[in-house]
């Protein structure tokens, strides 16, 4: 049995889980904020945090998450830092079409966690 947290909630799944974190988030948990674009880990639209580190969910297998903490854009209502980042993006018009914005918001949080102001 694999155990990890997803936005603060404990998750338990079978060890044989062979799907990517992106597939798990979108298809099992119905969390559509994390997007799929390149499917190779290059574009960043699928970015989430794993133990506070920026991670491309399209190339990360769920079976590698045992004991880890995963945070997605869906955690924004519970996370003041994500809320401030989202509002900052809106204030300067940094949303473009919005498709990859969740990944950019998560990347910004990772940057600020590792290089606080």
Where are these regions (language model features)?
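Signature of N-terminal electron-transfer/Fe-S-associated modules in redox systems
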Residues: 1-117
């Amino acid at each position: 049995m694999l155990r990890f947290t997803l936005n603060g909630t404990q998750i338990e799944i079978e060890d044989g889980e062979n799907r990517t974190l992106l597939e798990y988030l979108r298809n099992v948990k119905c969390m559509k904020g994390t997007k799929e674009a390149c499917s190779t880990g290059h574009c960043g639209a699928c970015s989430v945090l794993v133990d506070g580190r920026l991670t491309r969910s399209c190339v990360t297998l769920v079976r590698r998450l045992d004991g880890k903490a995963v945070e997605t854009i869906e955690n924004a209502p519970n996370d003041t830092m994500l809320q401030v980042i989202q509002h900052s993006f809106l204030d300067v018009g940094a949303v473009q079409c919005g498709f990859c914005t969740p990944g950019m918001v998560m990347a910004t949080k990772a940057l600020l966690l590792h290089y606080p102001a």
